[in-house]
């Protein structure tokens, strides 16, 4: 896993029809497969999963299937994507791609990165300084997800461990550096 833009940018082919899939992640396969099998999952299972089955069947969606997607890298770094915005709470890739965690090339990079994927799919222009309101909004949403122990509707869940959203010191982003503990 790495923090580079992680969504799927293609269409699904279902028979002779095509459908644009919503942004999804690996966790969504749990609820999707459960829906395909007609299985009911308990509220305490697959807390971050949503079913893609309606989209795969070509059913019209009146609203996004999820509010945002949370990414968690191999080294524990977080990112959150909502619409065209992606907020990365790390100064490196968070995983195997360059710059790798701890690499000298990452030392001088900002600890918070914000990208507008509509205009910068390659994530080459960090716009966090120009959009502090987006940084604050996405940070607050991520903090809510951590506090709730889930990113989908349902009863709050306990986190297995204390969650620190940002690893290491952050200059000028107190909200993003807060520790959030599950209920």
Label every PLM stretch briefly.
Residues 7, 35-37, 127:
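Short alpha-helical scaffold segments that flank and stabilize functional sites
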Residues 2-3, 16, 24, 47, ...:
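Short coil/turn linker and secondary-structure boundary residues
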Residues 20-113, 117, 167, 171:
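C-terminal cap/loop subdomain of S1 sulfatases and analogous C-terminal strand-loop tails that border
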Residues 1-19:
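Single conserved hydrophobic/aromatic residue that forms the stacking wall/gate
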């Amino acid at each position: 896993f790495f923090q580079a833009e992680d969504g799927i940018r293609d269409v699904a082919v279902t028979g002779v029809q095509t459908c644009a899939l919503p942004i999804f992640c690996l966790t969504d396969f749990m609820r999707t497969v459960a829906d395909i099998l007609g299985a009911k999952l308990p509220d305490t299972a697959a807390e971050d999963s949503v079913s893609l089955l309606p989209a795969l069947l070509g059913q019209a969606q009146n609203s996004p299937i999820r509010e945002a997607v949370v990414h968690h890298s191999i080294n524990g770094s977080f990112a959150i994507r909502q619409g065209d915005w992606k907020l990365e709470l790390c100064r490196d890739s968070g995983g195997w791609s360059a710059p790798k965690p701890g690499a000298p090339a990452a030392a001088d990079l900002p600890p918070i990165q914000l990208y507008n994927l509509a205009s910068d799919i390659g994530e080459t222009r960090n716009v966090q300084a120009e959009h502090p309101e987006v940084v604050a909004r996405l940070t607050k949403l991520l903090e809510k997800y951590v506090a709730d122990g889930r990113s989908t509707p349902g009863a709050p869940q306990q986190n297995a461990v204390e969650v620190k959203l940002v690893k290491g010191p952050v200059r000028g982003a107190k909200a993003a550096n807060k520790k959030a503990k599950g209920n």
